Amino acid sequence: MKNIFKKLLIFMALLLFSCSPDNLTNENETITNSDSNNPGILKTSTSKISNTGTSKIWNFDNLTEWEDATQVGNPNYWIENGNLRIFANPNTWERSKVKTISSFAAGTYRWTVFVPEMGVGDMASIGAFLYNNDTHELDFEIGYGKQAIRDQLAAEPDDLIVYMTSQGYPFQSVQKKIKRGQWYNLTLQLTLTSNGRYTVSWKINDAIMATVQLSYGKTTKFKIYCSVENLQFIGDQIPQSQNYALFDAVEFKGI
């Protein structure tokens, strides 16, 4: 009888140990552990949660996470003193571009870019834009501008024209003047309405310049582009100068 009682006690102890809270996993729980270098900081296990927010900044010390997107001509860009220098040559229709390897959705996109003096009348554009396809594209494009647009905006000799465009759904293009030879923060802010569609705002140095409600939303993701392209819509002559831009940083903050 003693042997049976002893075996029963052992069995009950084993059963209690196997069911202790430390060995049970709740799929809805967040598992944490201490950082060995900072014991007071708790880390959250990403295996149990889904984090939809993303934050990225590229300072252009290199082109990691970017790839060539040049359409015409040679890839005319390199890293120079912590900036991406990108250009297009005169008397060509070169279209020099880089894009992110990854795609992104709702959030705030910011380019820090130096806009130099550009050739008078040149059909050349500095681009900071988001692209999915030809109708799902959101742009900043900066150039000398056609004379008709310059006249309409009463542009001074040291003014350039920035085109802020949604290429479709709906199409909208707004033009404003900016001064050449300056650094700018160009921001595209994509927020979501209650039905999951995007509202996009174009900002220059944090001042809102244009806004539009799009008919598409969060299922459409974009790659981020930096470019200098010779394009016919933005001037009155094939470029006579080598036009360039400097990109100091690109940033994305997801929501």
Language-model regions, residue ranges each:
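Bacterial Sec-dependent N-terminal signal peptides
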Residues: L14-S50
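Extracellular glycan-recognition surfaces and repeat-rich motifs
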Residues: N62-L84
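Short carbohydrate-recognition loop motifs
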Residues: N76-T92, D158-V162
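Secretory/extracellular carbohydrate-interaction modules
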Residues: A88-D158
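Beta-strand-rich interaction surfaces with strong enrichment in secreted/lumenal proteins
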Residues: R95-S102, Q172-I178, L214, D236
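Ligand-recognition surfaces built from glycine- and aromatic
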Residues: T108-R110, Y216-I255
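Short tryptophan-centered beta-strand motifs in secreted/extracellular beta-sheet-rich domains
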Residues: W111, Q182-L192, V200-W202
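Short, aromatic/His-centered strand-loop micro-motif at the edge of beta-sheets
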Residues: Y163-N185
